[in-house]
Amino acid sequence: MRSTLRKDLIELFSQAGNEFISGQKISDALGCSRTAVWKHIEELRKEGYEVEAVRRKGYRLIKKPGKLSESEIRFGLKTEVMGQHLIYHDVLSSTQKTAHELANNNAPEGTLVVADKQTAGRGRMSRVWHSQEGNGVWMSLILRPDIPLQKTPQLTLLAAVAVVQGIEEAAGIQTDIKWPNDILINGKKTVGILTEMQAEEDRVRSVIIGIGINVNQQPNDFPDELKDIATSLSQAAGEKIDRAGVIQHILLCFEKRYRDYMTHGFTPIKLLWESYALGIGTNMRARTLNGTFYGKALGIDDEGVLLLETNEGIKKIYSADIELG
């Protein structure tokens, strides 16, 4: 079934609520035959949708699938660009790897790769990202910004702002940003963001932003080494969270912030990022490849670099593990 027809059919059922819709009404709305309507409904059933059919009444949607799917993500997605070209797989080694391959084959800006499970998910510095089936959001977004190479780190901070805003809209949960790419709830990691670039000489060909979100994990779902430092949206909310809704809200927030960025530059993003960031104005320890620095975090500069006031002066921190306090 074509994605647009599938989306339109699900929307018809959702608008009808508990009421039946006749096959003829669906046929007219979708612009296809009654036989085609039946085939489309069978496709939805294969995806896990429970559709009741009653003679002389028509069809009604009883239950949506519990698992993440392309249809669930597409339905209700209100973006113009981000996520409109969607690649969904139940299992991938890494959404980031697949997104790189797609970008190399001229995938358009806004292409989104989503997996229900990753077998080789990774975060910053090639660290393993625990991404089990059925509980999280594992996705990678392809961008093609016309910006200088040195400005690409700004997109990590833009993504962090969009994730914070999207989570609040989707689940009503307030989160904090820990420089440069971690989203925390009560000091525990909930989201990781990985930004990678494809470039030729001084030209950005594409930027791939990977986002991993712990959505419905419970404490026992985490490996022992993560139980004390990781949490999920569900644990914070005290209820199960709709993963498709989280994706949709984040994509919409990202699209708005990205449009602001391409129109007005980094300043609006910088101000938002600092308003959500932990530790600005307080002491922190930055562990870098060139040593460990301790000092007061002043904020970020116009390139998104962390400014740390130390006894030796202001240090620019480009990449580091941060310890607050």
Curated annotation (Swiss-Prot):
Keywords: ATP-binding, Biotin, DNA-binding, Ligase, Nucleotide-binding, Repressor, Transcription, Transcription regulation. InterPro entries: aa-tRNA-synth_II/BPL/LPL, Bifunct_BirA, Biotin_CoA_COase_ligase, Biotin_operon_repress_HTH, BPL_C, BPL_LPL_catalytic, HTH_11, Transcriptional_repressor_C. One of its GO terms (cellular component) is cytoplasm. The keyword rRNA-binding does not apply. Biotin binds at residues 118, 122-124, 189. HAMAP family: Bifunct_BirA. PANTHER family: BIOTIN PROTEIN LIGASE, BIOTIN--PROTEIN LIGASE. This is Bifunctional ligase/repressor BirA. It comes from Bacillus subtilis (strain 168). The gene is birA.
